[in-house]
Every structure is written in C-alpha cells, then in structure tokens.
Amino acid sequence: MNQKTLEKIEFPDIINKLWQKAESFPGKQLALKVRPLSDSKIIEEKLLEVEEGLSYLRFKTVDLSVLSDFSEIFLKLSKESMLTGQEIYRLGQLLKVSKDTFFEISRGAFPRLKQIVKLLFFDEALVKDIERSFWPEGTVKDEASPELKRIRGQIARLKDKMREAVEKYLKEPELAKYLQEPLISVRGDRFVLPVKASYKSQVPGIIHDRSNTGQTLFIEPYSAVEAGNELKTLELQEKEIIEKILKDFTQRLACNLTEIKRTYELLGEIDLIVAKARLALELDAYKPRISENGVLSFKQARHPLLGKKAVPFDLTLGKEFDLLIITGPNTGGKTVTLKTIGILTIMARAGLFIPASPETEIGLFGEVYVDIGDEQSIVQSLSTFSSHLLNLKFILENAREGDLVLLDELGTGTDPREGAALAKAILEELRGKKVKVVATTHTSELAAYAIETERVENASVEFDPESLKPTYRLHIGKPGRSNALYIAQGLGLKEQIIEKAKSFLKEEELKLDKLIFDVEQEKRQLEKAKEEVANLLISLKEKEAKLNDELENLEKTKEEIIRKYREKYQQKLLEIERKGKLVIEEIKEKIKTYEEKNLAKLLEEARQKTKEFSQNFALPFEPIKPYRPKVGETVELVEVGQKAEVLAVGENYAIVQAGIMKLNVSFDQIRPAQKQEKENEKGQVKKAGLELTKKQNFNLELDIRGMNTLEAEPVVEKYLDNAYLAGVEKVRIIHGKGTGALKKFLWDYLREVPFVKKFNFAPQNQGGDGATEVYLK
C-alpha cells in the first residue's frame, strides 16, 4: 500500500494510538510495523486474534512493561561478554513473564494465543536462582553462594572492629582534645579521625587526606591499619566471587540465547494482540466481516479519530452502484466521510477492529488510491488544480478492476464548466475500468451525471434549513444542493436580489435544480411510504405479541384446570384404597365366622363391591407422570427447603432463581411448592434444625494461598454460594500478603457479589492484612 495514501487518510495516527496501547518495547516496535494485508485468510486470522485478546484482557494479570529494550543485552550475550547483575535480573524477569504468560493463557479458551505461547521458553530453576542471587537493582545477594555469605560476614565483623579501634579516641577525653570534631570520617574505604594539624604526633597513624586550609589532617590510627589491610584483602576476594557468579549466570543464559530471543519476540506479538484489543475498547470498535466480493457495506460507521463528535453513517458500495458522488456545500462533512471510508477499509485490512456495527462488510480491493487535500507546491510551481491533476493522472494510469478510488472535490480549482466536464470524463474512464469510486464535489453537473448514468449514485450531506448549518448526516440517493440562494434568503437578503440572482442562472442550471428538486420530492414520498410500512409492521408485531400473551394465559388456565382435577381424583383414589382395605377386613372377619360352604358366596360379594368402587371412581385422565417443572413455576429445593422460580427446563434438569442466586439442579432435587400452613408449621422445627446443622458443619475459613486468580475465582465463588445457602453470616478467606495480587482480585470480586454485606481485613491475631473477613446478608 502506498505510504502517501496511508498518510492522506491519517492511518499513521491510528498506528500511533496502537503504539501507545502496547506495554512492552517489542510490542511497540511491532505496532509501528502494522500495515494493511491483502490475503483474506490472514486478515480474518488477525481479527480473530484481537477477538481472543479482548477475552484475555478480562483475566490478564501479567505486566509486560518489564520487557524494555534488550538489544544491548542480547548483543553482549552473543559475544559471551559478562553481564551485569542488573542485566541478569532483567533476563530473569523476562523468563518469569514468559512462564506466567504461558500458564495464564493455557488455562483459558484462547486457541490462537495458545499456538503462540506453546513456543515460549522458560527455565523455572534458572529464574529461581536469579531471584535468589540478585536484587532488582543488580546487587548480588549474600545467598548467591555460601562463600560470598562467609566473606561478607567477615567484612562486616572487621568493619565493626575497625570502627571500635577508632571510636576509642572519641570516648577518651585525653585523646578527644586532639580532634577538630568528635566524629569518624571515611577516606578511601578507611576509617579516619579529623586531627588538628598541630597534634598529629599525638595520634600515631597514616595520613590519608588534609583539609583545604591545612588545619585538619585525616589520620587512620595504627590500631586500625592492620584491620584495614585485611579488609582490602577480603573485599578483593568478594569481588572475585561476584565476578565468578556473574560469569556463571552469563554462561547459563548464553546457552539459551536463541530461545530467549524468540520468547522476547513472541511476547511482543502477544502484547500487540492485546494492544489491538485495548484500541478496540477505546474506539468502541467491532470485528468487521471480510469478503472477497469487492463490496463495501458500512453500518453505523464513525471516523476513529473524532471520538464522540463523529456522526455515524450507512453506505453500501458495489451492490446497486459502483460510483458514489457526494455533493453539497463546503465544510459539510464530505471530506470526513471520504476519509472515514478510506481509514476503516485500511484498518480492517490491517487486522484492526473498526468503529462500526459488526454487520459491516469490508470487501478486499486490489489497491486503494486517494486524492484528498491541497498539495499546492511552491518548489514545483504547481497550483492546487495542477497537483490534483498529477494525482489523477497517476490514478488513471495505475487503477485496475477491483481497486478502490477516493477523490475529494473532483472538478474544482478551475473554471466550473470545464472542471465539471473533466470530472465526468475521469469518472467515465474509471467506470469503464470497473473501479469502485467515491468522489466528493460541489459541482451540480455531477449530480445530474449520477442520475443519468447506470451504476452511479448520488449522495449528500444533510443541511439544516433552520440553523443554516450542515448536520454531517449522509443521505444515499439524494443529490446535494449548494443552498447558496436558500442561505441568503434565510439570512434576510432582499427578495428582489434573490430573484435577480435566479435570473442570471442559465436555463440548464435551473433545469438541473428542478431535476434535483423532483428527485428529492420522490425520495421524501418513498421515505414517507417506508415509514408507514414500518409503523404497520410495528402494529402487527404488537398484535402478535398480544395474541401470544392470550395464548400463554389460556395455556396456564388449562394447566390449572388439569392440576385441580388431578388433585380431586387423587383424593378419590385414596378413598378407594381406604374403602378397599375396609372391604378386605370385612371379608376376613366373615371368613372367620362363616362356614366353608359360604366362602364362594363371600368372594363373589367382594368382587362385586370392588367392581362397584372401580365404576364409581374411574379416573378420566392418564396416570400421573413423574414430576417435571415448567418455566415460571415456583418450586422448593429439597435439600434446604428454599423456594425458587424455574427459569429454564432441560431434559432432566432445571435452572432456578433462588433469591439472588441462579442454580442448576436435577428434577430429584426439587418438588412443587405448596402453601400449606400446617405443613409449614410442622416443618419449622425440622428446617431450623437443618439450617443449624448446615451452619455447624460449614467450614468458616477458606485458604486460597498459592493459587493464581484464575484458580481462585471458581473456588471463592462456590465457597460463598454454599456459605450463603447455609445461612452463614461471616467467613474468613486467607489470601496471604505476597505481591497483593490475590488480595486485589478478592476485594474486586467481593464488590460484585450481591449478597456480600461488607468485608475487611481480619484482626491481627487472626491473619491481619493476610486474610479478609466477609459478612453475608
């Protein structure tokens, strides 16, 4: 893509925004290299990466800003030059970030990001050794080696001994009088005393320095000299040990230089994807549909650099028409519309989300050519018109079928009549090449050309006749008018002057104005008819909704009737069973009292009575099926006795709303909720006992130390849900102190839980700021 084209549609400004969104140095460098692509499959893949980046942003905790410019470090490693402690520590942080990023992305549903992180390199043992051996500023820790720790211990003890040897001069009054000041100074790593020059013989030792006036000599007493010499020896040994440690770590890192460099670059790629996602959030942008059919279909498109000031527009190019001519007055928003078309097309091809509806379709064009703005050149002695002509010449020579051409103020800068004629000829040439064109102009002749020519359409930016200002709204199919006479009339210019001006207009211009007026009239009539149809559709939908409500009410009534009949005949069935038992008991009694010969008669009598009961209490419906709840029905949770509303029903489970919580339960965990006061009274003691048991058995403390935020979230969620159902009023969650990441996650999460009343750090004797007490409603 021509760099000049990218600059004219302000694409570098978008790249600058993307650069700012990247955290790391490699990510920022990659952002500067983002350019439009031509392969639809690659573009689609880049857009899907941004989609994953948006999802990943919700979980991301790893800070990539530690990845600064490592080029000097990599150069030193390639030459096996010894690294400094700070450089080693920075490489350790790179490997740590690599490990954290790997595990963070591996736990989520990010297939494309996973393809990147599976190539990351990290050595956990090496990272631990580096963090054990170096402070962030690069100082080597005592724990780096036992030998270093021993030497530093000796150095510390020796320094104490030297200080004690010198301090005795401050403590003894006879010696203190020889000093200018009662303090100890350091000169060249040696402890010295500020001795008056006249008393130098009274403090035997080595003179290391003198004051500017010569009145003070800085003397190291002989009692401290031997210890000072020993200190120098120990410090040299310390330096040798540190150099050995630095060399060892340099060698370990150099062995993995190729993998480390690759990891650095891959983390930059991940950072770029996340930066694109951040930019999409800032611009309120969405993923466009990419196609190869050469159609541009913008829905609610906005210029990405105008923020809330941008007026959205709809535009489709390549279906009903291939050339669009936008007419209207200057400063009406024509150029902004043209730039919006260009920059959104390029952004989509660069794998960026665009500020437009997700229904927007971006067709791939071979090239995008642009002639926007004033390129008047003093050096080349070119006028505005000449510079436009040179651009147009280049476009006409290079544009091919399937390209997109954006032309601003076509036909201006010269005689209006000749300019319009030239503009028509240019458009005809491009139309013949089957090039897609969007051109802006305030030349009215081009509006007539659009009306008369096949696959050419007019558009205009709306003008408010009351405020006499443009609204920047785009209207497809409606040619624009200059509105000069209308504005003059609205501002109160004399009517005779307006009429005189009209008389100067040529007959062709008046005809053109009438043609535009007639088209506008037809457009208004069509819009009115469209509005009537829309209102009719709304009315039909309202009636349909009303009928659906009535059908739903009828269905509920039907179910209520069936329920009542079932209850009634269930009672009858119980009555049959009761009376049947009485008959059997009666028969048994008679069997005992009657003789054997009467047994047949008694059995026949029993059969007859059973038959009578069956006929009298025949059920008019099918046997009761196993309980299956309906959406909207109130049920009772078997385990806790709490009522809930059914939201959805599956094959053998239901989703219910219990208070402020949504639960997924099987049919055997719920039963119909019936308002039976007696049963409720009987159940009070039982329910209270159940709640008491659940409270007694519930663990009031949860430990999430050692987890990351992804692991901790479902554990905390389930724990709090169970605590709430059990009626627990207060729990304690132990998160530790550490980096503070778990505490931050927990407190952010608790703020969003509706049944959490409040939360705070635990008392000092119960964990302090390493634990959080949570109070439930």
Swiss-Prot record:
It comes from Carboxydothermus hydrogenoformans (strain ATCC BAA-161 / DSM 6008 / Z-2901). One of its GO terms (biological process) is mismatch repair. It is an enzyme of class 3 (hydrolase). Residues 702-777 form the Smr domain. NCBIfam families: mutS2 (TIGR01069). ATP binds at residues 328-335. Its EC number is 3.1.-.-, 3.6.4.-. Keywords: ATP-binding, DNA-binding, Endonuclease, Hydrolase, Nuclease, Nucleotide-binding, RNA-binding, rRNA-binding. InterPro entries: DNA_mismatch_repair_MutS_C (IPR000432), DNA_mismatch_repair_MutS_core (IPR007696), DNA_mismatch_repair_MutS_sf (IPR036187), MSSS (IPR046893), MutS (IPR045076), MutS2 (IPR005747), P-loop_NTPase (IPR027417), Smr_dom (IPR002625). Pfam families: MSSS, MutS_V, Smr. Endonuclease that is involved in the suppression of homologous recombination and thus may have a key role in the control of bacterial genetic diversity. Acts as a ribosome collision sensor, splitting the ribosome into its 2 subunits. Detects stalled/collided 70S ribosomes which it binds and splits by an ATP-hydrolysis driven conformational change. Acts upstream of the ribosome quality control system (RQC), a ribosome-associated complex that mediates the extraction of incompletely synthesized nascent chains from stalled ribosomes and their subsequent degradation. Probably generates substrates for RQC. HAMAP family: MutS2. This is Endonuclease MutS2. Belongs to the DNA mismatch repair MutS family. MutS2 subfamily. Homodimer. Binds to stalled ribosomes, contacting rRNA. GO terms for molecular function: ATP binding; ATP hydrolysis activity; ATP-dependent DNA damage sensor activity; endonuclease activity; mismatched DNA binding; ribosomal large subunit binding; rRNA binding.
